[in-house]
Amino acid sequence: MPPAPAIVRTLPSLRRALERLRARRGTIALVPTMGALHEGHLALVRQAKRRASRVIVSIFVNPTQFAPHEDFGSYPRTWKADLAKLAEAKTDLIWRPDVSTMYPRDFATRISTEGPAIARLEDHFRPHFFGGVTTVVGKLFIQCRPDVALFGQKDYQQLKVVTRMVADLDLGVKIVGVPIVREPDGLAMSSRNVYLSNEQRARAPTLYRTLKDAAGRLRNGDHLEAVMADGARTIEDTGFSLDYFEARHAETLSPVGSLKDGPVRLLVAAKIGDTRLIDNLGV
C-alpha cells in the first residue's frame, strides 16, 4: 500500500509544508477539489504530476458557492476513500482546511468577476456561485502559491472564469483545463451522480448523446437554431427540466449564430429529479 500523503489542516502547518516542498526545488501544482473524489479528479492529479514536481490537492466543501436551497449539507463527504485514492495517486500534500480557517468570523472580502462570469449560463441559474468560487480559489492560490492549477472542463464556465481572474489579478498561476472523464455510456463523471436513482441514471446519458448529435449536425452544416431547438426538445422529452442548452464562443462564452463565429462550445444544464447535471462539448 502506498504511503499516505502529508495532510495539513491549519495555515501555519501549510506554510511549513510548503517550505519543505519548495526546498526540494521544482514546481508545484494545485488541484482544488471539494472531495468525493472520482476518476475525473484523479485524471487531474495524474496530469498535475506530469506538469509539476510536487502536487497539492485541496479538499474543501466551500459553503459560499452554495445557495441556501442547494446541497451543501448533503454534498458527499468521503474522506477515508478520498485519502486512499490520493495515496494511490502519489499525491504529495493534502490541504484540508475547515470553514473557520477559510472564512474567519470577521471575514469581509470577496472577489467578483464579469466577462465569462456573466454569460447567462451558470451565473443566471446560480447567481451566488461564481462569487464563492472566485473567492475560495483566489484564497487557495494565495495560500498554496502553485505554479500551475488544474481544473476539469466539465465545469467549463468555471474554468473560463478562473482563467480570467488569474489574468486580471496577475496571480501568476498557469491554469490548465483537463478534458472531461466519462462513464462508458458517456455520462460526465460527477460527485453528484451518486444522487441519481437507477431510473434517473439510465436517462442521464441523454445529455451527452444530445451534445454529440448536435455537434455532428452543426459540423454537417445544419442550421444552428434548429439544431439547438431539437436538442432542447430531446432533453425535455427524456424527463429533464432544462436550464439551458446553448451554443457559445469557446473562449468568451458570448452567443454565436453559426460555426463561422469562432470556436464553438455547446453547454447544457438540466435537472432530473432533484439532481442537477451539467455537460459540454466542443464542435
Curated annotation (Swiss-Prot):
Binding site for beta-alanine: 65
Molecular function GO terms recorded: ATP binding; pantoate-beta-alanine ligase activity
Subcellular location as annotated: Cytoplasm
EC class: ligase
Transmembrane segments annotated in the record for this chain: none
One Gene Ontology CC term in the entry: cytosol
Function noted in UniProt: Catalyzes the condensation of pantoate with beta-alanine in an ATP-dependent reaction via a pantoyl-adenylate intermediate.
Biological source species: Nitrobacter winogradskyi (strain ATCC 25391 / DSM 10237 / CIP 104748 / NCIMB 11846 / Nb-255)
Single GO biological process annotation from the record: pantothenate biosynthetic process
Primary location: cytoplasm
Further details from the record: The reaction proceeds by a bi uni uni bi ping pong mechanism.
Record's protein name: Pantothenate synthetase
Enzyme Commission identifier(s): 6.3.2.1
Lineage of source species: Bacteria, Pseudomonadati, Pseudomonadota, Alphaproteobacteria, Hyphomicrobiales
Binding site for (R)-pantoate: 65, 158
SUPFAM superfamilies per the UniProt record, alphabetical: Nucleotidylyl transferase
